[in-house]
């Protein structure tokens, strides 16, 4: 019994430590909120802008739902898509693939972080998750490098799908600094995840 209590305490402390680290990176986000707070409109990333110029129909879509109800079936599909896309796509930079610094593209078998996000977004929308619940999100990773993840907006909070992690995490648990994300239903319009940016 003592070992069980001790292990439960250690898990609790490690989870609290991870949350504290993530929240330390995002002091303007409310610690107890299940969803990230937004701070108004902001600029579109150049990669998203150029992607939308090439594929206009992929960037604007009708969406009534800006979030989803998180059921066991939906959760299992989300985890499955995150793991399968992470394992199928080989990580390579845009410079290695296209010879340019930044290009967002649906990947065939290789890509960088934005490409993983676009692939996950496509797979989850095919499953029936409304596009408004799937938000491309620009962040800084644990090493302060520019990065992109997919945020899933649900009735139980915002969850992060990251090509660097097979686990789907609550936004507070991911060791990321949140910068901005697309608005529901339109990859051309973005909202800030921190004030004055």
What are these regions (language model features)?
Residues 1-7:
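Sec-dependent signal peptide recognition
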Residues 8-10, 109:
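N-terminal hydrophobic alpha-helix used for membrane targeting or insertion
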Residues 10-18:
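Hydrophobic h-region of N-terminal signal peptides that target proteins for export
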Residues 19-197:
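A structural boundary/capping signal
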């Amino acid at each position: 019994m003592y070992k069980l209590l001790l292990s439960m305490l250690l898990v609790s402390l490690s989870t609290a430590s991870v949350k504290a680290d993530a929240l330390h990176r995002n002091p303007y986000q409310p610690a107890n909120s299940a969803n990230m707070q937004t701070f108004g409109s902001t600029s579109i990333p150049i990669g998203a802008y150029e992607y939308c110029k090439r594929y206009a129909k992929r960037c604007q879509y009708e969406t009534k739902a800006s979030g989803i109800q998180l059921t066991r079936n939906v959760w299992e599909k989300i985890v499955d898509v995150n793991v399968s896309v992470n394992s199928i796509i080989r990580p390579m930079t845009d410079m290695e693939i296209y010879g340019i610094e930044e290009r967002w593209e649906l990947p065939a078998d290789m890509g960088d972080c934005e490409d993983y996000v676009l692939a996950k977004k496509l797979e989850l929308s095919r499953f029936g998750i409304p596009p408004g619940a799937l938000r491309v999100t620009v962040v800084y990773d644990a090493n302060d490098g520019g990065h992109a993840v997919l945020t899933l907006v649900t009735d139980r909070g915002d969850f992060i799908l990251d090509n660097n992690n097979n686990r789907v995490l609550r936004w507070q648990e991911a060791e990321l600094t949140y910068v901005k994300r697309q608005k529901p239903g339109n990859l051309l319009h973005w909202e800030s995840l921190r004030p004055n940016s």
